[in-house]
């Protein structure tokens, strides 16, 4: 039969460039890297059915030797001074991927943890939005993997119909070729050529962010498996009566010549003009008219009514009369009353153009107005526009207004700020038009999706977005699913014609064909079989040329990637539904809600039970990043400069669920320093082991675990060790709980505080006296505990900063092949509350002494004497035992420092010679003034300070006591000035007291 039918081949799988080899010997501490394997293709493109390729040479490493094999690590001298991210990131990533750590651990006993990656456009280049979702999803994935769950983070890319077509069209135009110069098949071939060359770019860029997703399962929305899913979904929905062809208003992109989704339309405030003109009343004289205002005078040619508010006394008497549409040969339209009309806008009379305005379209449907289309698909005026036929819409506006002025119909034109709809892809002005398209009924599909939130089966974080979600689904409109593009999922509809001649005539008069008869099928053969069964043998088939909206295939993503419609596919059984969907709040309706509706419709299940929404990444001033503002921060540039870990930690710790993040470049630099702090902590631990043999270093691994194993073991440790282990255990619980609540910012900040404050600034600083003291056994205990705490801290930090933690862990003595495969620190471990309290008191002692040293400008290296008075016997004993630690941290002269239960006689006899520091009701510290500073120099310094402060007080006092200032200035300003004066006077009193103290010492 002569069918005129042709099925376009679709390339279904992506190919990716083999990553550059990197020497990972440093990362593996002597373990030779496996031979590199090429990245798997996502499919093939040929006339035959493609074979899905999966390179799985090595699965998740679970053997006992890999999990427990010991390594002494490296030597301190082997490590560079600072963390060199550029030297390790590629090698570590390659090691993780090649050794199978990104695949699900099939032997894991925990519940599966599955995240479907929101598929970025295959045309895309990495931006901060990608960096945000990759960071957060990787934090979740790495944490779940370490917590023993069978973890799958499933990656992929979207074919991005409009974006890709636009990119390829621009490339062809640069070569002097237009899309219309070639056939559809030739253009599609060019698209596939482009994808083969550039399609893997976004994948490689996502890898630069450390994404630990299973690349062996990578999917593409046009691969064969997903194409089969799309066909099945369309046919299923059509068979249920949910897909239909109808006429409706759509967003039309004249240059692309396709309908676009609401998401692909961006509104911008732009300077424009509001045109006021006379709408002549039929049968009236020159003064019989309705004054009307419009921003688009060219659409007057498509008016089918003029509306006034029935409550408007100026015009309500004209309801029922008719107006004559200018330049249409006398065509008349009714004047109608409608409460929609805003009496305060413009003139209070509204021209109604149902064919080119969404609001007018709704009014027209409600009152039964005609719909007149005045534009061709390319944005030129059509034959309904008389002499303006063929004129571009923008030129028509200018010409028509000039004609209105010439005819005396123009009243005035004044500046007006318009909200202009523009194509997100091409930037062109979108034209609302009424068009015949394919639609999907949404009200029925929305019901179970609404119920899921109402019953709590689906949780949206943050919760406030549940209200938005419900509002959208409650007032949902049918979804326009057809697009007039050449690339994408071609709609599986075949129109039925009686003959080839009939088809040819239909094509001349109607792009879609005049026949309303059609069949829905999976392929040519099935279409022919169905058509013959319904209409007989003497027929010709013509396939629908439109393709499906990209969001249609994306809406199937959570289950199509797992093998649906094959319900028995292993991944459908093991990894569907997903655990969580993480994405930006801006696509909650356009993608998330549609996935939920499609999943219920196709599988009867929710696609995931939790939706976590992040906000936009803005610049430091809170502005949206854009090329026009010159404020775009390139994540790849940040990675090259500051390192991947610094970027990830900045994004993760700066995020609050659903809130936008203002990206501070200073914070990036600070977090780069944080990664170096982790590096230096590792070097410190290695330096403390420098004299140990490999066997002794390995022995520390198990010794540290034993010393910190439980309450009984921890109780035997010195105070500082009990404190740091307890702080670690409490931090593990807090971080785990925060991550379980998707509060990644709090989790990251908690780890930062523990590492920087507790571990590095307090514990490591204090440990030096024990590590390098005369007591060898105490030194060994401290080494073992320090190694244990750093190991567990690295595990805790790893999901956030994977590279520096892996590199440091590889350098330390350890068991196992890689940090990525280690267990999460124990949750609910013992916290020694009394030890924490005692050490916090010790910290207060040290902090107060440090403050006093700063106030008296004591040189940092100078050690001073002190008297610590603890009236509580138990505390007295505890601080006496920790005198070396206190002296180390506070820079005290340990030989001249005592711990007593009451002030010594020399203090009691001359308290004026001491600085008294009250820590709490039972704890005081006395510092001899003579030991703090040179009295003569200090008197001179303080006297200068006194003079300066007195001058400031005199000036501020005059201002505060001025009736003019008090009576005229705002009350808040006056109160602020009085507070400043009070503070200065208090500080001056302190300075004078110190001068007196020092002068007393000089006189002696």
Locations of the language-model features?
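Non-catalytic terminal extensions that flank enzyme cores
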Residues: 7-13, 18, 23-25, 32-37, ...
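Conserved oxyanion/phosphate-binding beta-strand-loop segments in alpha/beta enzyme cores
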Residues: 61-65, 74-116, 191-204, 312-340, ...
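Residue patterns forming the tRNA-binding/recognition surfaces of aminoacyl-tRNA synthetases
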Residues: 62-73, 77, 82, 90-91, ...
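Feature 926 captures the class I aminoacyl-tRNA synthetase adenylation module centered on the KMSKS loop
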Residues: 67-70, 276, 471, 475-552, ...
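N-terminal catalytic cores of NTP/NDP-binding nucleotidyl/phosphoryl-transfer enzymes
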Residues: 107-168, 230, 292-294, 299, ...
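Short, solvent-exposed turn/loop segments enriched in Gly/Ser/Thr/Pro and often Arg
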Residues: 108-110, 118-119, 152-165, 221-226, ...
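Extended active-site and interfacial segments that coordinate phosphate-rich ligands
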Residues: 131-139, 290-323, 350-355, 367-373, ...
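Metal-dependent nuclease catalytic cores in nucleic-acid-processing enzymes
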Residues: 135-152, 358-369, 401-404, 588-604, ...
